[in-house]
Amino acid sequence: MSAALKISTPVFPMSVRWKSEVLGSSDIFPTMNDAAEPSMVGGRFFDSLWSKALHPTLRTIVRLFRRITHCLSTMGAAEIPVLNEWLAYAIHQLLSIAHDCMASDLHECLRLSVLVYSMVEIKTFGGLPYMSSVVTALRSRLRTGLPQIQRIAPDLSFWMLFVGGMASKGRASRAWFVAHLAEVAEQLSLKEWDTALALLEGFLFIYQPACPQPEALWNEVKRQQALELDA
Protein backbone atom coordinates (compact mmCIF):
# COMPACT_ATOMS: atom_id res chain seq x y z
CA MET A 1 0.00 0.00 0.00
CA SER A 2 2.97 2.33 0.52
CA ALA A 3 3.52 2.29 -3.26
CA ALA A 4 -0.03 3.55 -3.75
CA LEU A 5 0.44 6.36 -1.25
CA LYS A 6 3.66 7.38 -2.99
CA ILE A 7 2.22 6.79 -6.50
CA SER A 8 5.15 4.58 -7.39
CA THR A 9 5.25 1.24 -9.14
CA PRO A 10 5.29 -1.76 -6.78
CA VAL A 11 8.77 -2.59 -5.48
CA PHE A 12 8.12 -6.32 -5.33
CA PRO A 13 6.43 -8.45 -7.97
CA MET A 14 3.17 -10.11 -7.07
CA SER A 15 3.55 -13.60 -5.63
CA VAL A 16 2.25 -16.19 -8.09
CA ARG A 17 0.78 -18.22 -5.24
CA TRP A 18 -0.96 -15.23 -3.68
CA LYS A 19 -2.30 -14.10 -7.05
CA SER A 20 -3.69 -17.59 -7.70
CA GLU A 21 -5.40 -17.62 -4.31
CA VAL A 22 -6.99 -14.23 -4.91
CA LEU A 23 -8.16 -15.06 -8.43
CA GLY A 24 -9.47 -18.38 -7.14
CA SER A 25 -11.96 -16.52 -4.96
CA SER A 26 -13.52 -14.64 -7.88
CA ASP A 27 -16.81 -16.50 -7.47
CA ILE A 28 -17.81 -13.93 -4.84
CA PHE A 29 -18.23 -11.40 -7.62
CA PRO A 30 -21.24 -11.36 -9.93
CA THR A 31 -20.77 -11.82 -13.64
CA MET A 32 -21.11 -8.37 -15.19
CA ASN A 33 -21.21 -7.68 -18.90
CA ASP A 34 -19.53 -4.56 -20.22
CA ALA A 35 -22.84 -3.55 -21.77
CA ALA A 36 -24.35 -2.90 -18.35
CA GLU A 37 -27.91 -2.25 -17.36
CA PRO A 38 -28.43 1.43 -16.52
CA SER A 39 -28.77 0.51 -12.83
CA MET A 40 -25.34 -1.14 -12.77
CA VAL A 41 -22.46 0.88 -11.37
CA GLY A 42 -19.67 1.67 -13.81
CA GLY A 43 -21.62 1.24 -17.02
CA ARG A 44 -20.40 4.53 -18.50
CA PHE A 45 -16.87 3.14 -18.65
CA PHE A 46 -18.01 0.64 -21.25
CA ASP A 47 -21.02 2.05 -23.13
CA SER A 48 -19.63 5.50 -24.00
CA LEU A 49 -18.02 6.44 -27.30
CA TRP A 50 -14.81 7.57 -25.57
CA SER A 51 -14.50 4.22 -23.77
CA LYS A 52 -13.43 2.53 -27.00
CA ALA A 53 -10.15 4.45 -26.80
CA LEU A 54 -9.18 3.10 -23.37
CA HIS A 55 -6.06 0.96 -23.05
CA PRO A 56 -7.16 -2.73 -22.89
CA THR A 57 -5.30 -3.38 -19.63
CA LEU A 58 -6.76 -0.26 -18.05
CA ARG A 59 -10.25 -1.38 -19.12
CA THR A 60 -9.65 -4.73 -17.43
CA ILE A 61 -8.58 -3.05 -14.20
CA VAL A 62 -11.55 -0.67 -14.27
CA ARG A 63 -13.78 -3.71 -14.79
CA LEU A 64 -12.32 -5.24 -11.62
CA PHE A 65 -12.92 -2.08 -9.60
CA ARG A 66 -16.43 -2.01 -10.99
CA ARG A 67 -17.10 -5.49 -9.64
CA ILE A 68 -15.65 -4.56 -6.26
CA THR A 69 -17.79 -1.42 -6.14
CA HIS A 70 -20.92 -3.33 -7.12
CA CYS A 71 -20.33 -5.85 -4.33
CA LEU A 72 -19.76 -3.10 -1.77
CA SER A 73 -22.90 -1.31 -2.93
CA THR A 74 -25.07 -4.42 -2.67
CA MET A 75 -23.49 -6.47 0.13
CA GLY A 76 -21.18 -4.31 2.21
CA ALA A 77 -17.57 -4.92 3.25
CA ALA A 78 -18.47 -7.27 6.13
CA GLU A 79 -19.98 -9.75 3.68
CA ILE A 80 -16.87 -9.85 1.46
CA PRO A 81 -14.18 -11.70 3.47
CA VAL A 82 -11.55 -11.35 0.73
CA LEU A 83 -12.18 -7.65 0.03
CA ASN A 84 -8.77 -6.50 1.25
CA GLU A 85 -7.00 -9.10 -0.88
CA TRP A 86 -8.95 -8.17 -4.00
CA LEU A 87 -8.41 -4.46 -3.42
CA ALA A 88 -4.67 -4.99 -2.89
CA TYR A 89 -4.56 -7.00 -6.13
CA ALA A 90 -6.48 -4.33 -8.06
CA ILE A 91 -4.30 -1.48 -6.75
CA HIS A 92 -1.14 -3.45 -7.55
CA GLN A 93 -2.38 -3.86 -11.12
CA LEU A 94 -3.26 -0.17 -11.33
CA LEU A 95 0.19 0.90 -10.17
CA SER A 96 1.93 -1.57 -12.46
CA ILE A 97 0.52 -0.01 -15.65
CA ALA A 98 1.76 3.53 -14.93
CA HIS A 99 4.26 3.34 -17.79
CA ASP A 100 1.55 2.29 -20.26
CA CYS A 101 -0.70 5.21 -19.30
CA MET A 102 1.79 8.05 -18.91
CA ALA A 103 1.77 9.20 -22.55
CA SER A 104 -2.02 9.70 -22.66
CA ASP A 105 -3.78 12.36 -20.60
CA LEU A 106 -7.02 10.37 -20.74
CA HIS A 107 -5.39 7.14 -19.56
CA GLU A 108 -3.23 8.69 -16.85
CA CYS A 109 -6.01 10.91 -15.47
CA LEU A 110 -8.29 7.89 -15.35
CA ARG A 111 -5.63 5.72 -13.71
CA LEU A 112 -4.96 8.33 -11.03
CA SER A 113 -8.68 8.95 -10.49
CA VAL A 114 -9.36 5.25 -9.92
CA LEU A 115 -6.39 5.12 -7.54
CA VAL A 116 -7.71 8.09 -5.56
CA TYR A 117 -11.20 6.56 -5.57
CA SER A 118 -9.89 3.27 -4.16
CA MET A 119 -8.01 5.06 -1.38
CA VAL A 120 -10.74 7.51 -0.37
CA GLU A 121 -14.06 5.86 -1.15
CA ILE A 122 -13.17 2.23 -0.38
CA LYS A 123 -10.30 2.27 2.12
CA THR A 124 -10.76 5.79 3.56
CA PHE A 125 -7.10 6.81 3.55
CA GLY A 126 -8.15 10.39 2.83
CA GLY A 127 -6.72 11.80 6.05
CA LEU A 128 -3.24 10.34 5.68
CA PRO A 129 -0.38 12.77 4.93
CA TYR A 130 0.69 10.88 1.80
CA MET A 131 -2.74 11.52 0.26
CA SER A 132 -1.65 15.08 -0.46
CA SER A 133 0.89 13.81 -3.00
CA VAL A 134 -1.73 11.59 -4.64
CA VAL A 135 -4.22 14.45 -4.92
CA THR A 136 -1.47 16.76 -6.18
CA ALA A 137 -0.53 14.25 -8.88
CA LEU A 138 -4.15 14.00 -10.03
CA ARG A 139 -4.63 17.77 -10.12
CA SER A 140 -1.32 18.28 -11.93
CA ARG A 141 -2.27 15.85 -14.68
CA LEU A 142 -5.80 17.24 -14.92
CA ARG A 143 -4.38 20.73 -15.42
CA THR A 144 -3.04 19.61 -18.79
CA GLY A 145 -5.52 16.87 -19.63
CA LEU A 146 -8.85 18.32 -18.50
CA PRO A 147 -9.55 20.49 -21.59
CA GLN A 148 -9.34 17.48 -23.91
CA ILE A 149 -11.21 15.13 -21.56
CA GLN A 150 -13.90 17.73 -20.93
CA ARG A 151 -14.38 18.07 -24.67
CA ILE A 152 -14.65 14.36 -25.52
CA ALA A 153 -16.05 13.05 -22.22
CA PRO A 154 -17.52 15.77 -20.00
CA ASP A 155 -19.31 13.17 -17.87
CA LEU A 156 -16.01 11.41 -17.16
CA SER A 157 -14.32 14.72 -16.35
CA PHE A 158 -17.07 15.45 -13.80
CA TRP A 159 -16.46 12.11 -12.08
CA MET A 160 -12.67 12.64 -12.05
CA LEU A 161 -13.06 16.12 -10.56
CA PHE A 162 -15.56 14.89 -7.99
CA VAL A 163 -13.22 12.12 -6.86
CA GLY A 164 -10.44 14.69 -6.58
CA GLY A 165 -12.72 17.07 -4.72
CA MET A 166 -13.63 14.38 -2.20
CA ALA A 167 -9.96 13.53 -1.64
CA SER A 168 -8.96 17.19 -1.27
CA LYS A 169 -11.25 17.90 1.67
CA GLY A 170 -9.39 20.13 4.11
CA ARG A 171 -6.65 20.86 1.57
CA ALA A 172 -5.90 24.02 -0.40
CA SER A 173 -6.51 22.19 -3.68
CA ARG A 174 -10.21 21.76 -2.85
CA ALA A 175 -11.04 25.18 -4.34
CA TRP A 176 -9.48 24.19 -7.69
CA PHE A 177 -11.61 21.07 -7.94
CA VAL A 178 -14.76 22.94 -6.90
CA ALA A 179 -14.20 25.68 -9.50
CA HIS A 180 -13.81 23.18 -12.33
CA LEU A 181 -16.71 21.04 -11.07
CA ALA A 182 -18.91 24.13 -11.26
CA GLU A 183 -17.88 24.64 -14.88
CA VAL A 184 -18.45 21.03 -15.94
CA ALA A 185 -21.73 20.78 -14.03
CA GLU A 186 -22.95 23.78 -16.01
CA GLN A 187 -21.78 22.16 -19.24
CA LEU A 188 -23.73 18.98 -18.37
CA SER A 189 -26.78 20.94 -17.13
CA LEU A 190 -26.57 19.27 -13.72
CA LYS A 191 -28.91 21.25 -11.48
CA GLU A 192 -29.82 18.92 -8.61
CA TRP A 193 -27.88 16.53 -6.39
CA ASP A 194 -30.00 13.54 -7.46
CA THR A 195 -29.03 14.12 -11.10
CA ALA A 196 -25.36 14.49 -10.22
CA LEU A 197 -25.51 11.36 -8.08
CA ALA A 198 -26.99 9.32 -10.93
CA LEU A 199 -24.10 10.40 -13.16
CA LEU A 200 -21.49 9.53 -10.52
CA GLU A 201 -22.99 6.08 -10.02
CA GLY A 202 -22.53 5.49 -13.74
CA PHE A 203 -18.80 5.43 -12.98
CA LEU A 204 -17.31 4.26 -9.67
CA PHE A 205 -19.16 5.62 -6.67
CA ILE A 206 -20.60 4.20 -3.46
CA TYR A 207 -23.44 6.32 -2.12
CA GLN A 208 -24.06 6.06 1.62
CA PRO A 209 -26.94 8.25 2.84
CA ALA A 210 -25.31 8.49 6.27
CA CYS A 211 -22.16 10.01 4.74
CA PRO A 212 -22.65 13.77 4.18
CA GLN A 213 -19.36 14.50 2.36
CA PRO A 214 -20.48 13.94 -1.26
CA GLU A 215 -23.54 16.16 -0.98
CA ALA A 216 -21.50 18.73 0.95
CA LEU A 217 -19.09 18.90 -1.99
CA TRP A 218 -22.02 19.32 -4.37
CA ASN A 219 -23.33 22.19 -2.24
CA GLU A 220 -19.92 23.86 -2.54
CA VAL A 221 -20.18 23.49 -6.30
CA LYS A 222 -23.61 25.14 -6.31
CA ARG A 223 -22.31 28.02 -4.18
CA GLN A 224 -19.42 28.47 -6.60
CA GLN A 225 -21.88 28.65 -9.51
CA ALA A 226 -23.93 31.25 -7.65
CA LEU A 227 -20.82 33.35 -7.00
CA GLU A 228 -19.90 33.24 -10.68
CA LEU A 229 -23.40 34.36 -11.65
CA ASP A 230 -23.20 37.31 -9.26
CA ALA A 231 -19.74 38.33 -10.47
Predicted regions and their residues:
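Intrinsically disordered, low-complexity activation-like regions
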Residues: 1-231
